[in-house]
Amino acid sequence: MAKEKFERTKPHVNVGTIGHVDHGKTTLTAAITTILSKKFGGAAKKYDEIDSSPEEKARGITINTAHVEYETASRHYAHVDCPGHADYVKNMITGAAQMDGAILVVSSADGPMPQTREHILLARQVGVPYIIVYMNKADMVDDAELLELVEMEVRELLSKYDFPGDDTPIIVGSALKALEGDQSDIGEPSIIKLAEALDTYIPEPERAIDKPFLMPVEDVFSISGRGTVVTGRVERGVIKVGEEIEIVGITPTVKTTCTGVEMFRKLLDQGQAGDNVGVLLRGTKREEVQRGQVLAKPGSIKPHTKFSAEIYVLSKDEGGRHTPFFNGYRPQFYFRTTDVTGSIELPAGTEMVMPGDNVSIKVSLIQPIAMDEGLRFAIREGGRTVGAGVVAKIEE
């Protein structure tokens, strides 16, 4: 069956469901696709179609995720739902599915549970910018005061992890009732309300091409009589011939000028996000640029050696370590195109980290790397991946 053509007419936003096991994330996902497909077109997905999600690999880690899409009047949404808690942890840390916003599902009957807290913390650590709450299973609660209590608890929990708890949209409903076609407030109308909250509360994400120019250096060679050419894939922004750029990371930052952009051996006047290009640099020697550095718009990114991160450590079954690691562990951190050695400081009270765990750590690299908060990396030992992580906060 041929895939339907992807209409690029509406702005595209990435979202996903998060929350405690059995609070109804997958049922809600099914309800959203079913109800919005009736109203705006698109494909309805049943619970079991979403639940039997295929495995995918991100940075060498196998993750189960279900991808569905749906439309509202003004937007196109790509939505990810994970079957198991471990899949969420891996998904959010590797950035396999970057989220512009998340729908936190909380059972009205149970209130916030341990994974509710953990998913909010993860969302904060990995830089999910917006959370909307769907208080599910409202048909199981008769007492309005109890619903208010759960709502208060959820708002407090969000505020505790630096989300604006007081201003977060909270929609009360029952995904199951909505799927059954119930027309009361907690049925179908609650899903329409949720869609409206997605449209209004999550701002339209900035497109990669509109961000400041950045290109990781993959290869460097000199062309006699023309100078040094750096090749790579433009990660964001646009580079035009004649523009000043900085070479950032590993060695002290230097400025240079782009004197040419080529793609498939053709000269262009610019390269943009997504293009694989060669950038010709004026007056730069071949030995002054190396893999692991980035070319960037001057002042847009700085090199750093110390940061805190959230990491997931591969289990033995995933091809990771067989033994735990301890404070002071020194693996390689693979950023964009190269490995840099760094040492790990564990949080107070954490003796060791077992394969299969996720943990917040502090890292000191032996060489500075161009980084922003939210940058993903792999943790490697002798070339094999033993973990994945994301920069949560830059220290220096």
Swiss-Prot record:
Q: Where is this region: G3?
A: 81-84
The record's region (G2) falls at: 60-64
Which sequence ranges form a coiled-coil region, renumbered to this chain?
A: none
Where in or outside the cell it occurs: the entry states: Cytoplasm
Give the matching PROSITE patterns: G_TR_1, G_TR_2
Any one cellular component term from GO for this entry? cytosol
Task: Identify the Pfam families for this entry.
Answer: GTP_EFTU, GTP_EFTU_D2, GTP_EFTU_D3
Cite the residue spans of the region called G5. 174-176
Catalytic activity field: GTP + H2O = GDP + phosphate + H(+)
Task: Give one GO term, molecular function aspect.
Answer: GTPase activity
Source organism, top-level taxon: Bacteria
Query: Which parts of the sequence are annotated with region: G4?
Result: 136-139
Say which enzyme class the record assigns: hydrolase
Kinase: present as a keyword of the record?
A: no
Summary of subunit composition and partner proteins: Monomer.
What's this chain's function? GTP hydrolase that promotes the GTP-dependent binding of aminoacyl-tRNA to the A-site of ribosomes during protein biosynthesis.
NCBIfam families (UniProt xref)? EF-Tu, PRK00049.1, PRK12735.1, PRK12736.1, small_GTP
Name of the molecule in the record: Elongation factor Tu
Which organism is this entry from? Thiobacillus denitrificans (strain ATCC 25259 / T1)
